[in-house]
Amino acid sequence: MSMFLDTAKISVQAGRGGDGMVAFRREKYVPNGGPWGGDGGKGGSVIFRVDEGLRTLMDFRYNRKFKAKSGEKGMTKGMHGRGAEDLIVFVPQGTTVRDAETGKVITDLVEHGQEVVIAKGGRGGRGNIRFATPRNPAPEIAENGEPGEERQLELELKILADVGLVGFPSVGKSTLLSVVSSAKPKIGAYHFTTIVPNLGMVRTKSGDSFAMADLPGLIEGASQGVGLGTQFLRHIERTRVILHVIDMSASEGRDPYEDYVSINNELETYNLRLMERPQIIVANKMDIPEAQENLKAFKKKLAAQYDEFDDLPMIFPISSLAHQGLENLLEATAELLAKTDEFLLYDESDLVDEEAYYGFAETEKDFEITRDDDATWVLSGEKLERLFVMTNMERDESIMKFARQLRGMGVDEALRERGAKDGDPVRIGKFEFEFVD
């Protein structure tokens, strides 16, 4: 059996933009040729694409770092550097992508072929041909390429199924799935034979079809990690109907009604929303003599928990082994699915603010000023730091341009207001310079 992996932590880094070029046209009979340096190419983005052929996140077990290529540098004759190709990362249907730092959901990938840009490549730096003006017709200025976005991500796979089978171990969930679909789950006369989710397609005699998922068995205390815990319950979150399978023969010595209550308590503890899904009670192993009396007692206890005007959950007596009662169960399940809408998986508060996350929202401050213990003024801020890394500090004209940009942003004035004096050290990242008043 292939290994099943439904969670992974990875890092992605988009490619840096290529640096712009400083070059001048030098040709015979072309005096004062002027600037001729081209722009750098765009860095490659990291894109997630859904592949319906994938079933687990196993590909991410050993490959956890994904880095797109950088754009090429600008060239002479005003030619642009070649942009880097985007890095396509394939994920299975049902993959939720979260920001590892905040836990917020970035995207939920459920459609085959669906694509999402997870990390955007940096834009190419401008060459000196872009900075020519009447006052400075031969500028020795070019920008460095913009760094690509870098993110730490958590991937979580929740398989796509319409119907989920839940219940204690060895109540017959896997047998039921194997009988009503072409799935071949492992079946055995011991607990936790099923240790990974299994998926099968079910077709009723009336022509309806739906996907059914068999989950590893739960036991009391699963929400505290007993048994296999609730690690696989995430796979039931996309389902619209739950089939609660109960061993009505009580062959394990447990009371069927207590089983029913215990499993529902575990579902509620794991995720309160799971109890919003309609349940059908599947009274299995009815071919065993004791099951009939147990079913009567079960119905009596169940009815005692409801008011006389409440609708009781539907109960279908079946025997997966003897193929009894299956047709009625499947038809009722299909009818319930037809009138049950999909459930909202995430609240608005669970999602990232897309404008802020992808840098579209305007920040309140372009920069911040702090002071270190050694009396150095420290400048920080996303916009300011982006300007800094795109400045070629090896060319005087580029440094002067950066100084003008800082002045235009109000950095000089803000430093004066904070008490900065002429000659005070100022630091941006690892670059240090003196404040000139």
UniProtKB/Swiss-Prot annotation:
CDD domains: Obg (cd01898). Its cofactor is Mg(2+). The keyword Cell inner membrane does not apply. InterPro entries: G_OBG, GTP-bd, GTP-bd_Obg/CgtA, GTP-bd_prot_GTP1/OBG_C_sf, GTP1-OBG_CS, GTP1_OBG_dom, GTP1_OBG_dom_sf, OBG_GTPase. Gene3D superfamilies: GTP-binding protein OBG, C-terminal domain (3.30.300.350), GTP1/OBG domain (2.70.210.12), P-loop containing nucleotide triphosphate hydrolases (3.40.50.300). Its main location: cytoplasm. The keyword Kinase does not apply. Pfam families: DUF1967 (PF09269), GTP1_OBG (PF01018), MMR_HSR1 (PF01926). GO terms for molecular function: GTP binding; GTPase activity; magnesium ion binding. Residues 161-338 form the OBG-type G domain. Its EC number is 3.6.5.-. Residues 359-437 form the OCT domain. GTP binds at residues 167-174, 192-196, 214-217, 284-287, 319-321. It comes from the Bacteria. Keywords: Cytoplasm, GTP-binding, Hydrolase, Magnesium, Metal-binding, Nucleotide-binding. It is found in: Cytoplasm. HAMAP family: GTPase_Obg. An essential GTPase which binds GTP, GDP and possibly (p)ppGpp with moderate affinity, with high nucleotide exchange rates and a fairly low GTP hydrolysis rate. Plays a role in control of the cell cycle, stress response, ribosome biogenesis and in those bacteria that undergo differentiation, in morphogenesis control. This is GTPase Obg. It comes from Streptococcus pyogenes serotype M1. The lineage of its organism: Bacteria, Bacillati, Bacillota, Bacilli, Lactobacillales.
